[in-house]
A protein has these predicted regions:
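Glycine-rich beta-strand-to-loop/alpha-helix junction loops that act as flexible
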Residues: 29-34
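Structured mid-to-C-terminal alpha-helical surface segments
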Residues: 1-27, 38-41, 53-231
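Conserved donor-binding loop and adjoining core beta-sheet/short helix segment
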Residues: 44
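Structural signature of FAD isoalloxazine-binding scaffolds in flavoprotein oxidoreductases
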Residues: 50
Length: 231
């Protein structure tokens, strides 16, 4: 993957979403790319993830999103209209990954808090999960991803580690709503999951292309243990 080109494509899509009144008012930016662009995480991120405003018309949103893809000459390879999930392909040199995933989730969490943030990279403002909400959802992500997809993602552990190092606040209500557990009970469950399922191989496979070489080699041996200590 050409990281600079991929980042440029993401910025173009985000700029057009911000300039579309309907999308900007009904799609709320979240996830790793959002955290990276706001300076909360120091890694590369490859997908665009959003929450959808309650009561929004998914068909209308789908139409507006596809207009942006057409405008930017992005070919839709995979489309799940009922889930508002898209994989689009952009032009690049041969033999390089050149796909971007855009996901708009309608699995609403009433405890999520959203606010507008200015994104200097694109000179636009987007409504996003606020920082405590983002951290809470990061903590829920490892078990939620494994439950839905049977996948263990090293980036989930890295993000939790980085958020703890920065001493970011946590919206405990999100954890309670999404897991049905109080904070301490959920953290106990998360610790057991990490101890059992996160391996050095998991970390290496997921993070080697998301971190620069120096940072990757510095963190890979200690990430699991340090994260468990934080928890």
């Amino acid at each position: 993957m050409n990281n600079n080109l991929h980042k440029f494509i993401m910025y173009r899509v985000l700029t057009n979403i911000a300039d579309d009144y309907l999308l900007a008012s009904t799609m709320f930016f979240k996830g790793g790319t959002c955290a990276v662009m706001l300076g909360y995480l120091d890694r590369f991120s490859v997908d665009l993830d959003f929450d959808i405003k309650k009561g929004s018309n998914k068909n209308t949103i789908d139409e507006h999103i596809n207009k942006i893809f057409n405008k930017l000459d992005l070919k839709v390879n995979v489309k799940q209209k009922e889930k508002l999930f898209y994989t689009v392909k952009y032009k690049t040199k041969e033999n390089l990954q050149s796909t971007l995933k855009v996901s708009v989730s309608d699995e609403l969490c009433e405890s999520n808090v959203y606010k507008p943030y200015k994104f200097d990279k694109i000179d636009r403002t987007l409504i996003c999960q606020d920082l405590p909400t983002m951290f809470a959802n990061k903590l829920v992500a490892p078990l939620d991803r494994f439950k839905k997809k049977k996948i263990v993602a090293g980036r989930d552990i890295f993000d939790i580690h980085e958020f703890f190092i920065s001493e970011y606040p946590i919206n405990n209500a999100v954890i309670k709503e999404r897991t049905g557990l109080e904070f301490k009970a959920y953290i106990k469950k998360l610790i057991a999951f990490i101890e059992k399922n996160v391996t050095e191989k998991t970390i290496d496979q997921d993070l080697n292309y998301l971190l620069d070489y120096e940072k990757f080699n510095k963190i890979r041996k200690v990430l699991k243990q340090e994260t468990l200590l934080f928890l």
